């Protein structure tokens, strides 16, 4: 099946909604006239993923500056969690160059034998930690919650605010003017505003959006 075709028939590929963890993306689309309604519907925050039982005794984000840790982090090229937030956290602590070697790459050793940059951190970091290839990794809190629900051999270490970027990380969503299912798109956004949807997000580790945001 070719992209844009089903059984040889052309299909419209214009989506009805667009979502991003970077609100600037939606503001840009609004400015270009492609989107007229958008909102932040939930929040996330950074957390450290460690091996179950935390054998390295990692207690805080500043411990990423320790010399005895092997780290696994999202790459700064294609993974927004690090490109926009994780790297900023390391810079706030003054350890960005030490942890990353100032490298911009993926599926690579940023610092040989010390810091690995993933291609898909949500899959690779838990596995590397379980396999003993890494001691710690920057992830979303929701990823720690999900991994533990799945019985993975990992734990989470909370990162104190404001380093965890909880006031900056908002999942935004909006309806696109060229979408063919406008009514359904607006109904879906209304659902995301409901207490039921907010409770579901919270059960996975998200922080509810404020009434002003939704």
List where the protein language model places each region:
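Exported/periplasmic ABC-transporter solute-binding proteins
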Residues: 1-4, 9-14, 22-23, 27-31, ...
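Acyl-donor-binding surface of acyltransferase catalytic domains
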Residues: 34
